[in-house]
Regions:
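Conserved, short, structured surface segments that act as functional micro-motifs
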Residues: 163, 186-230
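Conserved positions in beta-strands of structured domains
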Residues: 118, 148-150, 178, 195-198
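Short histidine-centered loop motifs in beta-beta connectors
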Residues: 70, 167-191
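Short, acidic/hydrophobic/Gly-rich beta-strand patch recurrent on exposed beta strands
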Residues: 131-134, 161-167, 208-211
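C-terminal motif of bacterial Sec signal peptides marking the signal peptidase cleavage site
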Residues: 13-16
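Zn2+-dependent peptidoglycan hydrolase active-site motif and core
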Residues: 149-178
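Extracellular LysM carbohydrate-binding repeats and other cell-envelope/extracellular binding modules
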Residues: 18-28, 34-44, 53-56, 60-93
């Protein structure tokens, strides 16, 4: 990331994701899944780390992590720097309200692509807190709501090429992509094509779609609804 954004973000654990095609996460890749590491004690910054990525792996809000460690610029951390992964005494995590799941979802949201859900959201699985939608290679992947592009690249481990969009106070990750059509800081509208569907698990076309609000990963159905709308 080159731009400072006041984000509670999806994060970067820089790793090679050859050509943007998904080939299944390695054991190392799984450490990039949100919440794969439990907060507690300090974390020592390693080469290639970003605050964005560290917050992601611990399931934390990047701005809160920055505040706990007196970091004024979330894009500037040093190799060897020790970071507290729990709040100081007397400081609580900010509460997050996630909408209940409904058939229609939230106003202003729609499904990001056409197809059949091939993997449902699983709150008990670090790698399963997302929807995977199967379809046809090259079919349009669209913004699920109006928003601003926060990230474009292949630094989300195990996900190939990805786009993260800030939709108000919700961040959505779209991954397994080909032919990305947007850039960081670009404003997009609901239904606007942002990329094409690439190859997902089992070498079949798919879209990985994950939503996050504050420090919590949320079931995408809370926003897009269980009944497809395009």
């Amino acid at each position: 990331m080159k731009h400072a954004l006041p984000l509670a973000l999806f994060a970067l654990l820089l790793a090679a994701c050859g050509g943007g095609r998904y080939h299944g996460p390695t054991a190392y890749d799984l450490h990039g899944q949100r919440g794969a590491m439990r907060p507690g004690g300090d974390y020592t910054v390693r080469p290639g780390d970003t605050l964005f990525g560290i917050a992601w792996r611990y399931g934390l809000d990047i701005q809160e992590l920055a505040n706990w460690n007196s970091i004024s610029d979330p894009n500037h951390i040093l190799v060897g720097q020790r970071l507290h992964t729990t709040p100081p005494r007397g400081v609580a995590l900010r509460p997050v309200h996630i909408p209940q799941i409904s058939s229609n979802g939230q106003p202003g949201w729609s499904w990001p692509t056409r197809g059949r859900v091939i993997s449902e959201y699983n709150a008990n699985s670090p790698g399963g807190k997302n929807l995977k939608i199967g379809g046809s290679l090259g079919q349009p992947v669209n913004a699920a709501a109006d928003g601003e592009v926060a990230y474009v690249g292949s630094g989300l481990t195990g996900l190939g090429r990805a786009v993260v969009i800030r939709h108000g106070n919700v961040f959505a990750a779209y991954a397994y992509l080909d032919n990305i059509r947007v850039k960081e800081k670009q404003h997009v509208q609901r239904g606007q094509q942002i990329a094409s569907m690439g190859i997902g698990p089992q070498n079949t076309p798919a879209l990985y779609f994950e939503t996050r609000q504050g420090s919590q990963t949320a079931n995408p159905y809370s926003y897009i609804g269980t009944t497809p709308r395009y």
